[in-house]
Amino acid sequence: MQKTSILILALFAIAEAVPTTGPIRVRRQVLGGSLASNPAGGADARLNLSKGIGNPNHNVVGQVFAAGNTQSGPVTTGGTLAYNNAGHGASLTKTHTPGVKDVFQQEAHANLFNNGRHNLDAKVFASQNKLANGFEFQRNGAGLDYSHINGHGASLTHSNFPGIGQQLGLDGRANLWSSPNRATTLDLTGSASKWTSGPFANQKPNFGAGLGLSHHFG
């Protein structure tokens, strides 16, 4: 946890060191959201209200949101406060899922490469989690996020659960179709995760895949 906190502070310092250009302006409130098909049933819906201060390269954005599945499960509500400076930044997120868990997460990220088509970010994170039955645990780690201008992407994440074990995760997304304004997309997704230490280390890797249609508005 201490190492993760140091990394978060280091990345935030990098963000502060990057010079900014352009005037600061107040943005209007933006109501947006998304609706995505879920192979397990129903559709995953999200509604969010955001307001930011700054310009596209240097800003602070606050957001409140609600997300859930149209067929089953409780609705998760929460809020995020994010700071961005030329691709570097940090965020604080608090979520509540009734009858399931409460999570408070801190994250910092730094842009490593961006040529207008390919983007690569490094991130560190820490979270405090409390389940509905009172059990509490922490999660911290680091990862790399890659994205392509055409909607493809991948992420590699290493997570540490103090007192439980460590886990390695890989997620990928291939965009098969997009509407002209990219508001609606058809994506093929895949994921893999494996416990690398702890009592679950002898379990087989967990794989997942899906084909989903998503629409974003706002």
UniProtKB/Swiss-Prot annotation:
Free-text tissue specificity from the UniProt record: Hemolymph (at protein level).
GO BP terms in the entry: antibacterial humoral response; defense response to Gram-positive bacterium; defense response to insect; humoral immune response; innate immune response
Swiss-Prot/TrEMBL induction comment: By bacterial infection (at protein level).
Record's signal peptide: 1-17
A GO-annotated cellular component: extracellular space
Prodomain positions: 18-28
InterPro entries per UniProt: Attacin_C (IPR005521), Attacin_N (IPR005520)
Stated family: Belongs to the attacin/sarcotoxin-2 family.
This protein's name: Attacin-B
